[in-house]
Amino acid sequence: MLTPVVSYTTVREVKGPLIVIEKTRGVSYGEVGEVIGPDGEPRRVQVIEVGTDYAVAQVLGGTLGLPAKGSTVRFYGKTLKIPVSEQLIGRILDGKGQPRDHMPLPPPEDFRDVNGEPLNPYSREYPEEPIETGISAIDGLYTLVRGQKLPIFSGTGLPHNLMAAQVVRQATVRGSEEEFAVVFVGVGIKTEEALFFMDEFRKTGALRRAVAVLNLASDPVAERILAPRVGLTIGEYLAWQLGYHVLVVITDMTNYCEGLRELSSGRGELPGRRGYPGYMYTDLATIYERAGRARGRRGSVTQFPILTMPHDDITHPIPDLTGYITEGQLVLSRAMWGKGIYPPFDVIMSLSRLAKDAIGEGKTREDHKDVANTLIAAYSKALEIRNLATLVGERNLGWRERRYLRFADAFEQRFIKQGYYERRSFEETLDIGWDVLSILPEDELTNARPQITQKFYRRHIFESVQL
């Protein structure tokens, strides 16, 4: 049990999730302690601002029923650390790292600071090995790479929760004898969503290789800020100490940013764009930059954060700043979802900056780059022709243009669309890609190398298409 270094009874104000302590000396930023109200119940606190003679601390257990008068604050001279262990795999925790599954925590193997240990940029290795998610739109076009941070930009009402559960269930590292684990972090999610994830992980067996950190919307806002860091701290321990390849799935980072804005408002800070704090970019970077690979270490940390864009606005500060930090984005389309296509990816708006270095011969298959480049280019042209057809009518188009319309329909219905419980390997994804590309004339596939087209093009499919 920790011995308090100093105690204060000078709580000046309780404001939302924050308390202000006066006449402080020697209290450090990030230091943890506890506040004890008149009822004698201790609540964990963490210092988030230090002045000349005062300190502001966030109460991780919430301030409901906590008065300023009669409360005592004790500080321990230490930063916030959580117990970590390999035996956390298979467990469900809350946003503070405490059990949510009504079972005791396993014996700790170590205690780790939730803020992590930054990787020396010189020691980072460039990500070059793929992660197979089993989802064709990701694996085929925008491959997720070990050590990458690749977010999903979604919108209210779109199936990002289904996608998160599917990725947790299906993701794997192929051809590797090294261990693979998933850390799932739910940030500010509703009880209904938490029950869905817990039931889904248990029912499908995904929990056997996963750690779930669930912070509910009804939990204190300070815990919402802590939850992603708890999940990443567990993931970093599994990766850097035990050699696991860890995929960290975080949903919903919009809830995190809303919590950040609430805390900033409570501290009386000058707001930035749309009321969010001016340091939100830096704060998000402290989360996203914890992904990567390190020279001399076997493991890796890959991040797959999900955020909902308010009003589907990709220029909103949350997706805007996220895009500056991460290495691409996967954008979900409301129009595709309206067509009944799952997962409803917006192929043209999506991007993975590292995918080109993690695909090809020896990694996925020799034709992977050719398929991805050709599919995207052909679909982009097909969308232009589809718009033209709405003006002049399909009957007035040439036979090549009509081929592109058939290709676009097949691409959406056969390549992009797949079942929630359907898992496709890289080979299956690429084979479907060639099936839909073969609707087009062979001389239209200019983004593929001639020798690759000659080897994989399905001429019998081209000849069987009815116009």
From Swiss-Prot:
Pfam families assigned: ATP-synt_ab, ATP-synt_ab_N, ATP-synt_VA_C
Subcellular location: Cell membrane
GO biological process: proton motive force-driven plasma membrane ATP synthesis
Annotated segments matching region Disordered: 95-114
GO molecular function: ATP binding; proton-transporting ATP synthase activity, rotational mechanism; proton-transporting ATPase activity, rotational mechanism
Cysteines paired by S-S bonds: none
Oligomeric form and interacting partners: Has multiple subunits with at least A(3), B(3), C, D, E, F, H, I and proteolipid K(x).
Listed PANTHER family: V-TYPE PROTON ATPASE SUBUNIT B (PTHR43389:SF4)
Protein name in UniProt: A-type ATP synthase subunit B
Origin species: Pyrobaculum aerophilum (strain ATCC 51768 / DSM 7523 / JCM 9630 / CIP 104966 / NBRC 100827 / IM2)
Taxonomic placement: Archaea, Thermoproteota, Thermoprotei, Thermoproteales, Thermoproteaceae
